[in-house]
């Protein structure tokens, strides 16, 4: 189904219906409006901003022809050049110090992670060993119980065979009463 132009001119592009201007008063409302706009057309790719580049100072010049000092007279252009070079060098040194401090903290963090992981593995191994020891103890107790039961059964069977001979003698006797009758 084709959308009709209001002007009915073939070369004229369609205008979108104007939406009321909504001004967000709070950050939450602003975020809600952005989400609503994104969800109107879910097939369209959402703009994801890339991480901004980290600031790097300009590399120091490899060769400086005429080195100027701070003794340049006030009002001369040389003093301003010296001052800017000095400021840039201080910035570079501060950046390198911060970078080395960050690397040092990262290394300490990684070492601490490894140390904590090793301690956790040691605790786990110790507990595992304790569990295995308890399990072995239970198995040994169970085996000992089974063996003692077997010994008792064998003693009963040997005593029952001896008592069977006695029972045969008892069987010869006639019972004086009959069970189950009143």
UniProtKB/Swiss-Prot annotation:
One of its GO terms (molecular function) is protein kinase inhibitor activity. It is found in: Nucleus; Nucleus, Nucleolus. Residues 1-18, 27-43, 114-124, 144-156 have a biased composition (Basic and acidic residues). GO terms for biological process: mRNA processing; RNA splicing. Residues 164-173 have a biased composition (Acidic residues). Keywords: Coiled coil, mRNA processing, mRNA splicing, Nucleus, Spliceosome. Residues 1-80, 114-182 are annotated as: Disordered. Disulfide bonds: none annotated. Residues 125-143 have a biased composition (Basic residues). Residues 99-157 form a coiled coil. Residues 126-138 are annotated as: Required for nuclear localization. InterPro entries: Prkrip1. It comes from the Eukaryota. Residues 51-143 are annotated as: Required for RNA-binding. One of its GO terms (cellular component) is spliceosomal complex. Belongs to the PRKRIP1 family. This is PRKR-interacting protein 1 homolog. The gene is prkrip1.
């Amino acid at each position: 189904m084709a959308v009709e132009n209001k002007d009915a001119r073939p070369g004229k592009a369609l205008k979108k219906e104007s939406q009321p201007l909504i001004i967000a008063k709070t950050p939450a409302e602003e975020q809600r409006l952005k989400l609503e706009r994104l969800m109107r057309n879910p097939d369209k790719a959402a703009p994801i901003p890339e991480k901004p580049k980290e600031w790097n100072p300009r590399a120091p010049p490899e060769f400086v022809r005429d080195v100027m000092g701070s003794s340049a007279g006030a009002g001369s252009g040389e003093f301003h050049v010296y001052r800017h070079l000095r400021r840039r060098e201080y910035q570079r040194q501060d950046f390198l110090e911060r970078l080395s401090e960050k690397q040092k903290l990262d290394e300490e963090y990684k070492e601490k992670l490894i140390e904590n992981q090793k301690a956790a593995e040691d605790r786990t191994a110790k507990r595992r060993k304790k569990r295995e020891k308890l399990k072995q103890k239970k198995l040994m107790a169970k085996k000992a119980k089974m063996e003692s039961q077997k010994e008792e059964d064998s003693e009963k069977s040997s005593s029952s065979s001896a008592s069977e001979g006695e029972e045969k003698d008892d069987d010869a006797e006639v019972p004086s009463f009959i069970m189950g009758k009143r």
